[in-house]
Amino acid sequence: MAAVTVTGAASLPARADSTIIDDWSKAKLPAPPQLKPVTLDAKTTALLVMDFTVQTCTPARRPRCADSVPKVKKFVEEARGKGALIIYSVAVPKSVPGDILKELTPAPGEQVLPPLGPDKFIASDLEKTLHDKGIATVVAMGTQAQTSVLHTGGEAALRGFKVIVPVDAMSADDLFPELYTAWHLSTAARISNQVTLTKLDMIGF
């Protein structure tokens, strides 16, 4: 059998051994997601007001969270007045409902989920509550964006709920996690088609 000669091999580039960490600074930000107006049916909508507590939502730790509180308060009060379901959560281990910011104090009878971690569906009756109340749409608001909003909002989408995320009602310790959360929820397979990004003043009932 005749020998086979491979030509041009020396001109092939050497295999790159860099990782995403090495190439981190080369990344370019994608275009920002589009924000869309939303009209909600209060009877089939639940607000998830996640982890707005004295431990997590302070001007020193998360100024964007602290700045969002007046707008979140106004929106929660409007939704409550229209009859929407309001569900709260606390995040820090051993935190209690009394740790929720006074501006966002739950009304009598409104559920407060205990510290459950990033995904509020895990080890809770949240999905059952939503189904029992006839909820089809959830509005995910909270801090941190990359934990409670990303994981609970994403999981709600995977469980078949429509998910509304007002980007001015989610926050983190710095900007990048907020950008990533918005990007992920608006692009991830099986999640993005259930998620709408918006602003609080673009939501009506």
What are these regions (language model features)?
Residues 48-59:
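Acidic/histidine-rich, surface-exposed loop or edge segments in extracytoplasmic proteins
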Residues 5, 61, 115:
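Generic anion/oxyanion-binding catalytic loop in active/binding sites
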Residues 18-26, 57-66:
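Acidic/histidine-rich helix-loop elements
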Residues 4-13:
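C-terminal segment of classical bacterial N-terminal signal peptides
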